[in-house]
Amino acid sequence: AICGHEWSGTLSAVGSEVKSFSEGDRVVVAVAPACGQCAPCRAGQADRCFVSFMSALGRDAMAPKHGGFAPRIAVSASRIVKTNPALSDIQAAQVEPTTVAFHAVRRSGIRLGDIAVVQGAGPIGLGAMQWVKAAGAGVVIVIEPNEQRRAIALELGAHYAVAPGAAADELVKE
């Protein structure tokens, strides 16, 4: 299998039963849909769906054989979302991690003026940092071991970006 997630593409064909997409549509991958039947789904925690998780691991019938690094893949219509055709491939590929970051911040219950600590300044961490700022966090602290990523976090509006360790622990305690 060829790996790859956080991809975008253009549909080269659609199945005869598919009515919501057309050949030529620009799409991005979505997280596998929740089944609605397993224990987490019944408890209102669709983000922890067993079926969705197994699909993400390539272990069910809905999972594509190959990922986004393959030149062509077959994907269930339930796993894709139309995107703005004006977005570049790089921009469109950020839809999934941005959505993950948004969901995490929404679940956090952050309120206006809160202090937010974001662990990591990769794509999802930087997205979460921007979402907590948009949600009204008063102070945003990013903890990241990579100096270049810390610099990016500061450029994007973090109040502090520090390496993990005693200094980070002290800053968070303040």
Positions of predicted regions on the chain:
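Mid-domain Rossmann-like dinucleotide-binding core that forms the NAD(H)/NADP(H) cofactor-binding site
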Residues: 78, 84-166
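Glycine-rich beta-strand-centered segment in the early N-terminal region that forms part
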Residues: 1-42, 84-87
